[in-house]
A protein has these predicted regions:
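Extreme N-terminal starter segment of soluble prokaryotic enzymes
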Residues: 3-7
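Short, glycine-rich nucleotide/cofactor-binding loops
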Residues: 8-18
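Histidine-anchored nucleotide/phosphate-binding helix
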Residues: 19-32, 37
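Short internal beta-strands
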Residues: 35-41, 97-99
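N-terminal beta-loop-helix "entrance" segment that forms/cooperates
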Residues: 44-56
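Short, hinge-like loop/turn segments at secondary-structure boundaries
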Residues: 53-57, 114-117
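A glycine-rich helix N-cap at a beta->alpha junction
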Residues: 55-86, 90
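A charged, amphipathic interaction segment
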Residues: 78-133, 138
């Protein structure tokens, strides 16, 4: 299992789900597993240079308690999701690719993306890179 990459399809662009993806990626990278993140639609939008540090809201199920939990996490020293991903890149092999179809639909250019994003690929390339590794959909 250690040889198989952890693959994350990041579809959601809410703060809580981005944080969950970042924690999963950094944990796997720290253990020496390769991590592939494939950014689609709202997940891709979150990686725009002009949005990456913006407050992106919470998932609807977070409800009234969501904002309080985010504040508690920050108070406890939890880094923002994008900072966690930067650390994960330092810890191990983390490859973040933007979905080419999502780029076209959302009219996003590669230069619009934060340097965390390593490139652009199609879904077929993502599956080839995923190999036999697990795929998480967030």
């Amino acid at each position: 299992m250690e040889d198989e990459p952890l693959n994350i399809v990041l579809f959601s662009g809410t703060e809580d789900r981005l944080q969950a993806a970042a924690v999963m990626a950094s944990g796997a990278a720290a253990l020496g597993r390769k991590v592939n993140i494939f950014l689609q639609y709202w997940g891709l939008e979150a990686f725009r240079k002009d949005r990456i540090t913006a407050g992106l809201g919470l998932a609807p199920e977070a409800g009234e308690r969501g904002a309080a939990l985010v504040a508690e996490a920050a108070k406890a020293g939890q880094q923002p999701w994008h900072a966690t991903l930067r650390v994960a890149k330092e810890l191990g092999e983390l490859d973040i690719q933007a979905c080419s179809l999502s780029m076209d639909v959302l009219k996003i250019k590669e230069e619009d993306l934060d340097p965390l994003v390593d490139g652009v690929e199609g879904v077929t390339a993502f599956y080839l890179n995923a190999g036999d590794g697990h795929i998480l959909f967030i």
